[in-house]
């Protein structure tokens, strides 16, 4: 699968890169340090992408003892995940944005593709450079922003605040050559998606 079904194939891998995929890869590799894996009956897929990973832990809503621990790379790759987007949970204070950035960099150094979202449940957003737009433009690993609505744990942002956050993520993405999206945690509050529907209807920000 890549991602559509390709049928039965041979795959040649050099180091950490796929060099060739073909019906049959033949050759004399006896003088090389080559390992052959017989994968008959198995399924080969690209590494999975997880767009919502609390790499420095989350929780803490019932006190310090309820905080979840930092994630290790072994817990990520054992499930076939090779690309992650790191983000804050409810707590963006005791777990700061600098720690999130450092962990994102560490995971990439350990061998996976790692990106992150700036901001958290808190508004105004905690950022690395002083603004969401500047994070988007100047911090290579920042690809979007996060906030929360319709949730008792959110900062109860107004529609104008969410509009400004989304606009900064979008325009910063344009300038920085990124998608520039806004990741919004949605709680079980009575307002549900009404704020987002209003923003899509009333502003020029692409949904």
Which residues does each predicted region cover?
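Histidine-rich, glycine-flanked metal-binding segment
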Residues: 1-45
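Active-site mouth loops of central-metabolism enzymes
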Residues: 54-67, 118-124, 152-156
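Active-site environment of divalent metal-dependent phosphoester hydrolases
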Residues: 56, 90-95, 122-124, 188-194
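Hydrophobic faces of well-ordered beta-strands that scaffold small-molecule active sites
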Residues: 47-51, 84-86, 114-118, 141-149, ...
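Metal-associated gating/positioning segment near the N- to mid-region
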Residues: 36-102
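Divalent metal-coordination and catalytic microenvironments
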Residues: 11, 16, 41, 52, ...
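Distinct, well-ordered alpha-helical segments
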Residues: 125-133, 159-164, 190-203
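Active-site core of metal-dependent hydrolases
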Residues: 153, 167-207
């Amino acid at each position: 699968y890549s991602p559509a079904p390709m049928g039965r194939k041979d795959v040649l891998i050099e180091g950490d890169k796929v060099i060739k995929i073909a019906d049959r890869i033949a050759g004399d590799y006896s003088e090389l340090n080559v390992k052959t894996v017989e994968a008959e009956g198995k399924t080969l897929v690209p590494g999975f992408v997880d767009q919502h990973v609390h790499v420095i832990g989350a929780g803490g809503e019932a006190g310090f003892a309820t905080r979840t621990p930092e994630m290790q790379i072994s817990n990520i790759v054992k499930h076939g995940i090779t690309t992650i987007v790191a983000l804050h949970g409810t707590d963006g204070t005791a777990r700061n944005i600098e720690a999130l950035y450092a962990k994102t960099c560490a995971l990439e150094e350990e061998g996976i593709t790692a990106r992150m979202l700036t901001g958290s449940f808190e508004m105004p957003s905690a950022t690395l450079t002083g603004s969401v737009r500047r994070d988007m433009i100047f911090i290579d690993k920042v690809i979007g922003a996060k906030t929360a609505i319709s949730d008792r744990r959110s900062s109860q942002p107004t529609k104008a605040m969410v509009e400004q956050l989304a606009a900064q993520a979008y325009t910063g993405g344009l300038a920085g050559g990124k998608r520039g999206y806004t990741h919004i945690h949605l709680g079980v509050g009575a307002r549900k998606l009404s704020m987002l529907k209003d923003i899509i209807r009333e502003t020029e920000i692409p949904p």
